[in-house]
Amino acid sequence: MARSIKKGPFVDGHLMKKVETEGPNSKKIIKTWSRRSTITPEFIGVSLAVHNGKKFIPVFVTENMVGHKLGEFSPTRTFHGHAADKKSKVKK
């Protein structure tokens, strides 16, 4: 179920303050654990480091990302490939 339009997008207050003080063209990377925050137009041009549970993944916000959540750009799980077929290994 989508979020109600009358509520508006959710952005953590502490993250919004940091983005406003740093400005869009700042070289400084802002670290955040707030994966649930929605990217708004104020975030365009800002470099963020989004935590994935283990480390911080660098994310540079562009216009195409507006409306998405920060967590979408820092995957929490790594895919190492499917297990090989044991039968084919034994026959060789």
Curated annotation (Swiss-Prot):
The keyword Membrane does not apply. InterPro entries: Ribosomal_uS19 (IPR002222), Ribosomal_uS19_bac-type (IPR005732), Ribosomal_uS19_CS (IPR020934), Ribosomal_uS19_SF (IPR023575). The keyword Transcription does not apply. Gene3D superfamilies: 30s Ribosomal Protein S19, Chain A (3.30.860.10). One of its GO terms (biological process) is translation. One of its GO terms (molecular function) is structural constituent of ribosome. Coiled coil: none annotated. SUPFAM superfamilies: Ribosomal protein S19. One of its GO terms (cellular component) is small ribosomal subunit. Pfam families: Ribosomal_S19 (PF00203). Keywords: Ribonucleoprotein, Ribosomal protein, RNA-binding, rRNA-binding. It comes from the Bacteria. Protein S19 forms a complex with S13 that binds strongly to the 16S ribosomal RNA. Belongs to the universal ribosomal protein uS19 family. HAMAP family: Ribosomal_uS19 (MF_00531). This is Small ribosomal subunit protein uS19. It comes from Trichlorobacter lovleyi (strain ATCC BAA-1151 / DSM 17278 / SZ).
